[in-house]
Amino acid sequence: MPTINQLVRKPRKSKVEKSKSPALNVGYNSLKRVPTNESAPQKRGVATRVGTMTPKKPNSALRKFARVRLSNLIEVTAYIPGIGHNLQEHSVVLLRGGRVKDLPGVRYHIVRGALDTAGVTDRKQGRSKYGTKKPKA
């Protein structure tokens, strides 16, 4: 255990917390072509590849994903939530953080109902998470 005098001379270092969605913590100045330290809650990007992947054991499915080039020129893999989607290559999408536990390397979600991504059709409950408008009564 250090003495008070030792702590005065050299204080304790606080732990550095690693980000769970690092691509959202980097901005980009396109005029100067340099990355910046601007963080953002969401980022816009262009889908470069849309496909399916299989989850880790013990799960079994075909999970929909998109490879997205963000506005800060970083390319990431993002999950497409909900049943059915209208995304294809060159679709403009909005990304948020949030990993998918059974897909290794997928740390981002695509926001449904924003930009080129349509909301989930015929959804009655939990509509706000899937970008679905209120149905006509």
From Swiss-Prot:
Keywords: Methylation, Ribonucleoprotein, Ribosomal protein, RNA-binding, rRNA-binding, tRNA-binding. Gene3D superfamilies: Nucleic acid-binding proteins (2.40.50.140). It comes from the Bacteria. InterPro entries: NA-bd_OB-fold, Ribosomal_uS12, Ribosomal_uS12_bac. Transmembrane segments: none annotated. SUPFAM superfamilies: Nucleic acid-binding proteins. Residues 1-57 are annotated as: Disordered. GO terms for molecular function: rRNA binding; structural constituent of ribosome; tRNA binding. GO terms for biological process: translation. One of its GO terms (cellular component) is small ribosomal subunit. Part of the 30S ribosomal subunit. Contacts proteins S8 and S17. May interact with IF1 in the 30S initiation complex. NCBIfam families: rpsL_bact. With S4 and S5 plays an important role in translational accuracy. Interacts with and stabilizes bases of the 16S rRNA that are involved in tRNA selection in the A site and with the mRNA backbone. Located at the interface of the 30S and 50S subunits, it traverses the body of the 30S subunit contacting proteins on the other side and probably holding the rRNA structure together. The combined cluster of proteins S8, S12 and S17 appears to hold together the shoulder and platform of the 30S subunit. HAMAP family: Ribosomal_uS12_B. Belongs to the universal ribosomal protein uS12 family. This is Small ribosomal subunit protein uS12. It comes from Streptococcus gordonii (strain Challis / ATCC 35105 / BCRC 15272 / CH1 / DL1 / V288). The lineage of its organism: Bacteria, Bacillati, Bacillota, Bacilli, Lactobacillales.
